[in-house]
Amino acid sequence: MSKDDLIQFTGTVLELLPNATFRVKLENDHVIIAHTSGRMRKNRIRILLGDKVTVEMTPYDLTKGRVIHRH
């Protein structure tokens, strides 16, 4: 799968879960589970409750995603 196949959404962090995982409510009112991308872990970017984030998702599983940017 190429990078062009990924879908990006904006959402808000609802809940902090273990292992850098978050429950995120997307702008279309879907709630998904998202984990932090490797670059964000490497640079130690903290994500807190209520933060606006950009989530990247694959079209094959629309219940999971990856947080790629914090606004």
From Swiss-Prot:
**UniProt KW rRNA-binding keyword:** yes
Q: Which residues form the S1-like domain?
A: 1-71
What is said about its interaction partners and assembly?
Component of the 30S ribosomal translation pre-initiation complex which assembles on the 30S ribosome in the order IF-2 and IF-3, IF-1 and N-formylmethionyl-tRNA(fMet); mRNA recruitment can occur at any time during PIC assembly.
Name the species this protein comes from. Rickettsia typhi (strain ATCC VR-144 / Wilmington)
What name has this protein been given in UniProt?
Answer: Translation initiation factor IF-1
Protein family per UniProt: Belongs to the IF-1 family.
Per its UniProt record, what PROSITE patterns does this chain match? S1_IF1_TYPE
Localisation: Cytoplasm
Sorted alphabetically, which keywords does the UniProt record give?
Cytoplasm, Initiation factor, Protein biosynthesis, RNA-binding, rRNA-binding
Q: Which GO terms describe its molecular function?
A: ribosome binding; rRNA binding; translation initiation factor activity
